[in-house]
Curated annotation (Swiss-Prot):
Residues 1-152, 611-789 are annotated as: Disordered. Residues 23-60, 112-127, 665-678 have a biased composition (Acidic residues). A motif (DEAD box) lies at residues 320-323. InterPro entries: DEAD/DEAH_box_helicase_dom, DEAD_box_RNA_helicase, Helicase_ATP-bd, Helicase_C-like, P-loop_NTPase, RNA-helicase_DEAD-box_CS, RNA_helicase_DEAD_Q_motif. Its EC number is 3.6.4.13. The lineage of its organism: Eukaryota, Viridiplantae, Streptophyta, Embryophyta, Tracheophyta. Keywords: ATP-binding, Coiled coil, Helicase, Hydrolase, Nucleotide-binding, RNA-binding. This is DEAD-box ATP-dependent RNA helicase 28. Residues 13-66, 110-135, 563-591, 628-677 form a coiled coil.
Amino acid sequence: MPSSFFFEDASDDELELIRNQEDSSEEDVKEGEAEEHEAGEDEDGEEEYEEEDDDEEEEDEKRKRDADAQSPWDFASYSSSVGEEHARRHTTSIDEKISKAIQHRPVPISINEEEEEEEEEEDASDAETDKQEEYLSEDDEAAEYKPEDATPKPFFSTVDGVSFHADTFMELNLSRPLLRACETLGYKKPTPIQAACIPLALTGRDLCASAITGSGKTAAFALPTLERLLFRPKRVFATRVLILTPTRELAVQIHSMIQNLAQFTDIKCGLIVGGLSVREQEVVLRSMPDIVVATPGRMIDHLRNSMSVDLDDLAVLILDEADRLLQTGFATEITELVRLCPKRRQTMLFSATMTEEVKELVKLSLNKPLRLSADPSARRPPGLTEEVVRIRRTREANQEAVLLSLCTRTFKSKVIIFSGTKQAAHRLKILFGLAGLKAAELHGNLTQAQRLDSLELFRKQEVDFLIATDVAARGLDIIGVQTVINYACPREIDSYVHRVGRTARAGREGYAVTFVTDSDRSLLKVIAKKVGSKLKSRVIPEQSIVKWSQIIDEMEDQYSAVISAERDERALRKAEMEFAKAENMLEHRDEIYARPKRTWFMTEKEKKLVAQAEKDSAGNPAGGELVSADRAEDLKMKEKRKREREKNLPRKKRRKLEAAREMLEDNEGEEEEEDEEGDEKRGRSRGKDKKKQETDKKGLTLKDLGYMRAKAVKAKQRAIDSGKMERPKPDKKQSRSKPRNQPRGEEMKDLFKSDMGEKKQGRGGAAAAAKPRTKSKNSFKSKARYKRR
């Protein structure tokens, strides 16, 4: 059977058990259908006597039930943990601080009256506000935009005969427990990417799939994986599937969806992400879950330090949002995880913006992968309406007023606002709260529980606006999002596609509004040409912008009060943490020092190089040349070759190098602080001067010094041989040894003549030198006469 590609053949007892489970589940499905049919007949009989108002209410309730049934995830368990977290830390939420600031210094903001005035103004200025001009004409778009070649690269296998159409999930050879789960979640007809991927994934082929946002890519890899796990050897507990994602929220969503799809099976799934308890995750990994959904960093941490999991039995590796995982920052971690995985495995890559570069794919050791692209002609959702709001150079300071005017006039609920930075997201959250608008924030400065709580509040529609960074741009399936506002214009094409993909999902309609400054205008044109979308311009009344600018100026004092309260609370929290740490060290000193030190697969220097490469890559605008992951990989290989050369050194030299390196690592923190202070005083130096300053501060190791001297000697010798440099002349000041014109004895006599007597001086005269020297008679006497006879 194809589904047992990597697993042992199931025994007869196991197959019989699975058949019994499927038969029972089929009976349950039939019984449920019969009950629904009977209930439907009763309702049909009663509907004849009901009023029209009751029918509308029932339809609304039915829509709500359908929306709830299709929701793939639920973060309600984290809402209570946020309150416990604030109680444990003795802190208050940002909403409490905002309400307190409003009570102490209220500002007269009458949004309702303002809306009434604006509605009266809209009638007079309809020609201005509703006038929308195409940002790109159709002729320009047809001439300048050229769709990418859909032919597969030689690296990929051919996909002849692959069908992107299926009427029901039963046509995809799925078991009854999975069909029952799909029916419970409200999945009736497979999407094109699901119809193409599920049959191929069941055969164990490597896949590289892409489709538009909201097309059901998660179910496309989750359903075939669960189908294969139904036929696993159940007596052998092991982790057989690893799913990697770039963000924690996406990992939590995938974990929740897999649990819903596997609710009628015995398959276990574990969640391993940062921000949650490490000890609890170790317990989960020791139980050997069949599927692990993780972020790369935390998974490597457990593999190296917890000793509670290994990847020896891994059969399937899945990379969701693969293009982001293969970029700088994640590439080294993904390469390390792939190195730890068995070579005989199935690898699947999924993303809405999959690149055709094969360098990164080759690193993953893919085996003749299939390149699948559903809806290649539709580069964006068909129900998406894209608009731009131009921010003039003289009005860039009023961008917040433009946003508030837009959110109070046109888009009043189910809106995601991408702020660009964490600081901007937090400021907008406070301003929205002071203006009386219900909003939640989502960015990296929040704890993991707070981030998940914000998503849950927005999903339940308890707040109307979600102000987020690009953390929420990828993969999150939030049903009912009507509008996406790019408060900060995206710098890359992929970022724009993923941001606007949060709305108009699964055939629904949605709006995407982008704020464009003069510096972003040319960039957005490039994005529009390559994505293939037609952007239209929206004009906001000047009077509304001026009014909100005045309101924001009046709210600055309240904003400062909230920021001051947060700063004081943060300082108090830091002092409490330091006190608790010192107390814990005194109480559990021996236990803490007995723990092994946590390790990482990269040194501190390599971490800094990768971080710098990621920063350079993020700083380049879209359309420019991005810094690839090869730079970080080359730097890592250079360091590896240096370490290999060090191993061949003598033992004493090697020990000296290790000692020097340890001293440098210990003093890194102090040196960084000195560097920052120096940069603030003197300004940042560039090029060779900066390298020279860093070298002078940090010093050189013996190895580096030896390399530099050897290079200098070789360069000098090459210059002399080529004639570029004259051979150095000997130094005249250097003392030379004089040739000896007299014997050694005469020389010594001349030196010590004053200390010698006349008799000794006479022995060495000219006559003595001319007369041949003869032995004295008494110079040697034989001792033979003294011998015994």
